[in-house]
Amino acid sequence: MTEIIQRKLNDSAFVRWTALILIALTMFFGYMFVDMMSPLQSMIEAQRGWTPDVFGMYGSSEFIFNVFGFLILAGIILDKMGIRFTGVLSASLMFIGASIKYYGVSDAFIGSGIETWLNSWWVSFPGSAKLASLGFMIFGCGMEMAGITVSKTIAKWFEGKEMALAMGLEMAIARVGVFAVFTISPWLANMAPATVVRPVAFCTLLLLIGLLTYVVFTFMDRKLDKQLGLDA
């Protein structure tokens, strides 16, 4: 009796490392967006009237929803819905939040009805900072959800293989985004005419690319699930 052994998708080193790169890019772009504004504090204070206190409150807004238990909810969603749904959801939240933040600091926001309304309450906190903080909150939810999703994804694709190496490499790729943005963000902002909007727009576009790379990964993961006999 001859036993036929089916080679699974993640048995191929090339395929599983390609999958890792696709999901790592999502995190790479996410980490770029997290720290994109850090080297631009003085510029946004000058161009949008923020104070150091306002900038500090904006920076902390990324974690507000997560402090109040969103990460627990994210874990429940991941267990119930799986890595494909949760990964696309998290990348979408990152892009949506980034888009809101982009609008908040853009020239189009200045003089708009939304700015007038946002400036009518909590007047010490500019409307642009309020909207940028809201976007950063939503982005932060997606970012932290993506973090646990990527960990579960690597555990699935690298089970019995180079799991620890894959986790370390994914984190290394993601953290390079922090290093890169401290060079890229000021360079983009200082191009004539100098503006904080340009690096925000650039990193928002990268998050859209990160969403698309994760969508590409979902097709690979669906094929792996079929090979494993799991529900597609």
Residue ranges and their predicted role:
Residues 60-76:
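Central cavity-lining transmembrane alpha-helices of secondary-active solute carriers
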Residues 92-124:
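C-terminal ends and interior cores of transmembrane alpha-helices
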Residues 129, 135-172:
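Cytoplasmic helix-loop-helix junction between adjacent transmembrane helices
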Residues 170-222:
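Helix-loop-helix hairpin linking two adjacent transmembrane segments in secondary transporters
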Residues 218-232:
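Flexible cytoplasmic inter-helical loops of multi-pass small-molecule transporters
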